[in-house]
Structure formats: C-alpha cells, structure tokens
UniProtKB/Swiss-Prot annotation:
Protein known as: F-box protein pof7
Residues covered by the F-box domain: 105-157
Key word Cytoplasm present: yes
Subcellular location as annotated: Cytoplasm
Subunit description: Interacts with skp1.
Gene name linked to the record: pof7
Pfam families assigned to the protein according to its UniProt record, in alphabetical order: F-box-like, FBO_C
Entry keyword Coiled coil: no
GO biological process per UniProt: SCF-dependent proteasomal ubiquitin-dependent protein catabolic process
Entry keyword set: Cytoplasm, Ubl conjugation pathway
Annotated GO MF terms: ubiquitin-like ligase-substrate adaptor activity
InterPro entries linked to this entry: F-box-like_dom_sf, F-box_dom, Hrt3/FBXO9_C
C-alpha cells in the first residue's frame, strides 16, 4: 500500500469515528452541489450549517479531496505503465511472414474510384437522402481525396437546397430561392446552403433566463439574495406550428417529453411530476422571412396574444422584441427584454419520429 493510500485510509477512519465531522462533511458536499446548480442562497445556508457542526470542515474536506486526487493519479500511472509493458511484450513477438501467394497487392484500385464524378455525385446524393442526415458529409469526405473533391461540387449543394425547401426549413418557393442565389450569394449553392438562415425541426430551442431577487430576513445585515433561473422552450414543426413553454424545470426533465403527442404538457391539472408547477405549454404558429426574421405567435389567454420577434443567427434565435396584442382592441404592449436571453438550439435524437425534416448536424 502506498503512502497516499495510508494517509487516505487514516483520514477516512478518523471521519468515520467522529459523527459530527461526518455530518459536517455531508452538509459541505451538499453546499458545493447547490452552488454548482446556481442555488446560491441554499448553498450559503448549508455552508453555515456545516461550519456550525464542525469548524474545521473546510480544511478537512480539501485535504480528503487532495488525497483522493493523488490516489487516482497514482492508479492511472500504474495502469499506463502496465499497458506499456504489455505493448512491449506484444511487439517483441515475431509477426508471421507472408508467402508469395499471400502477399498483398497494393496496386489494386477500389472500383468506386474508377467511377466518373457525375455518377459518384448521384450516388452520394441518393445515399445522403436515404440517411436523412447531412452530418455524414464530413465523415465521407475524410475517407479519401476522391470523395472530398466530389463533396465540393456545387450541384450537390443545389439538391440539398431543394431538399430544404421541400422540408419547409425555408418558407420560400424554389423560384424565390433561385432569385436569391443570384442576388445575394454569387450563384454559389454551397454558400447559400451554409449561410442562409434556416429553421430546425430535429431539436428544440432553449433560452436560459436568470435574475436576482432580494429575499427577506429578520436582520437587515443578513438579507439573502436569490438567484432565480427559469427556461423558455420553443419547438418548431414543418407545418408552421410550434410549442412554447416557460418553466423552472430543467431541460433534462422537459426536452424528452416536449411534443404535441404529450397531452399532459398542455393540461394544468397534469399528474406528471415534471409539469406539476402549474405551467402549461401553448401551441402557436411561426413564420420566417428570407432574411431570417422569425415571428412566434401564440395565444396567452382569451384576451391576449403574445408575439415573439426573433432573428435567426446560426443555432441561435436573438430577441428583437416581445409584445402582447389585445384580441378585442388590437392594442399592443411592449414587454421588456431585461431577463430574456437568446434561444440556443439543442438537437434531440428522439424528435426524429414525429419530425419528417432532414436532420442537420
């Protein structure tokens, strides 16, 4: 047993014998966890509680962490040394020699490299359409120079652009896309495909909003400050419909069930624990201009309709304005964007079942 292991085992024995120290360390670990999650008020209370139980809890915790880190480093070094010795043993074994009949003929050229570029482009286009995932482009390009050269062809990106029009990622006709190609993108289909703003259907957009709120206390010198975190969720569908949801629930609990098929998402009396805070999702419609300006319209109540005006910037939706419209008087009321943060797209693989659009990486 090494010196570090001896020290660590002695420290752990001391902790196990001291009940108060063990309790203080548990409070200290909970405080660190709360601080990482952003619950500053809760973490401060747990830090105070830990120091009340045992005044040296911080130094003991740091000493234990340091010893555990040293132990892990020693174990990794031992594993690396064992692996290197095993490699040396394998390399010392003589490899079998090939006979003349078994020798490898390195001059054989794969048949696919003999194909003309036009035929290869047709094959690649059909394969990628069947896979429904353009992320495979980079993997295919890395296989050989022939594929890398073929994937630079502008005609291939033209078919991708037509596919984007068919999948409603651009709410434009093919004719208007071709006109825009000449006016803005120097007749380069590749430039148009890579730079033109598009909507995404294979995931959802998430906005993480935070603000500080003063708390209450019996004494003025010890007034707590709460960090409030809530999330805005937005999911688009190819038929110009969308789901809007605002909640304090984290993405891990919401995203997998964020679908029109989930009826509990739209019911305020839902028994589902992840939607039990009284918030319900709202269905609305979305539209996007050729320049990437997006409008999200959804009814907040029988009296008011909310409108989110956003600008598409890659995987982000930047806020332009947020206002409500009175359904009877058409009076508009601007809402401040103080706490609102940009939506960021997050891909969700389970969304492919009810989204028929071409997936983008």
């Amino acid at each position: 047993m090494s010196t570090v292991e001896d020290q660590l085992s002695l420290e752990l024995e001391t902790v196990n014998k001291d009940i108060l120290l063990k309790k203080a360390l548990l409070h200290y670990k909970d405080a660190i966890k709360s601080e990482r999650e952003g619950n500053l008020g809760e973490s401060l209370n747990k830090y105070r509680l830990a120091h009340k139980v045992h005044e040296d809890v911080e130094s003991i915790y740091r000493r234990l962490e340091r010893l555990q880190l040293c132990k892990r480093n020693e174990e990794e070094e031992m594993l690396n040394s064992d692996a290197s010795e095993a490699m040396l043993t394998v390399s010392s074994v003589p490899s079998p020699t090939l006979t003349e009949n078994e020798s490898v003929n390195e001059s054989v050229v794969p048949n696919i490299l003999k194909l003309p570029d036009e035929v290869l482009l047709v094959i690649l286009e059909n394969c990628i359409r069947d896979l429904h995932d353009l992320r495979y482009l980079s993997s295919i390009a890395l296989t050989c120079k022939h594929f890398a050269k073929a994937l630079r062809a502008d005609s291939l990106y033209r078919s991708f652009c037509y596919c984007s029009c068919e999948q409603k990622e651009w709410q434009q006709s093919i004719k208007s896309i071709e006109e825009e190609l000449v006016e803005k993108y120097q007749q380069s289909w590749k430039t148009l495909f890579l730079k033109k703003p598009r909507s995404r259907f294979d995931g959802c957009y998430i906005s993480v909003c935070r603000y500080f709120r003063p708390g209450t206390s019996d004494t003025s010198w010890n007034q707590p400050i709460h960090l409030i975190t809530y999330y805005r969720y937005l999911r688009l569908y190819p038929n110009s419909t969308c789901i809007v949801y605002q909640s304090s629930n984290e993405p891990n609990d919401v995203v997998r069930n964020f679908s029109v098929q989930n009826t509990s998402l739209f019911s305020p009396m839902s028994s589902s624990p992840m939607f039990s805070n009284g918030n319900v999702a709202l269905t609305g419609s979305w539209s996007m201009t050729p320049s990437g300006e997006m409008l999200i319209v959804y009814p907040a109540s029988q009296t008011y309709t909310y409108v989110q005006k956003l600008q598409v910037r890659g995987i982000r939706l930047k806020w332009i304005s947020f206002y409500s419209i009175h359904n009877y008087t058409s009076f508009t009321n601007e809402m401040p964007l103080t706490h609102n943060r940009d939506y960021v797209f997050s891909r969700v693989y389970s969304y492919t079942a009810d989204s028929e659009s071409l997936k983008r990486g």
